[in-house]
């Protein structure tokens, strides 16, 4: 709701050949639909591809970047994801590898030091433009009572598919019209759910934290039904940056003068209020993915993995954790006795 991505996309519209790279299929779809109103645009994600003849702009998820292509203008969105242990390497690859005359990198304030460090490593010049929220964000005084306090324009936030479906089911049994968003929702259904809420055919949306990644939805109030999330390793309290990212979706500029945020208990509301008032901790890590050049080596997998293990990058770089790949490899080897299995074959099996 501060307009940084909006301004970057306005510049992208001027490109003869441009690309938008975002974190979500839904976000790629949103940009594709907006761009398509004005100019030929294609969309590429891991799940679907819409190719328009003579398209000037591609809207894609960040993993789909083809670094062999050249662009006039590129937009890399939500670059604070560069520290993410699972997907961050895709932002590292995009920032270091994209071939564009002009690059707009949209991020939260806490990511500026590591991103500008990467730019400096490339000996490129940069300019920092800061944007501020255009609508006031108000933390409510009283905790939210479910389902009595549900109102039109609410977004109820949980962190698992099961919780999304449970809460949506309860609301529907109360006679409310509900949209849902979660990561594994098929693209066509996900698109339909967003459309229903955007067009106010449903009054409430129940979502995981995917809603925080820049989706431009007519949300009046964010309700944190939970304040803990499982991050792949442990269940932990939400970080200040995560709370602010999600809460920031409330009060869409142009529809509301204010956005509201609340939680389901006095302790939860105090926690959300505290996190919103806490400064984000600066990012200190840049995630490195498994290099494609190693995949092209005509060597046994053991040799290639040993090469990767021996690489010790200097800060702020950190290698992606390939523990799960190694565990899978050991399992395959114990079953198949394929000690000389090539890495490309192994990746195909995976």
Model-derived features: positions:
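Post-DEXD/H (motif II) to motif III coupling segment of the RecA-like Helicase ATP-binding lobe
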Residues: 18, 80-138
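Accessory helical-bundle/CTD segments and flexible terminal tails appended to RecA-like ATPase motors
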Residues: 279-350
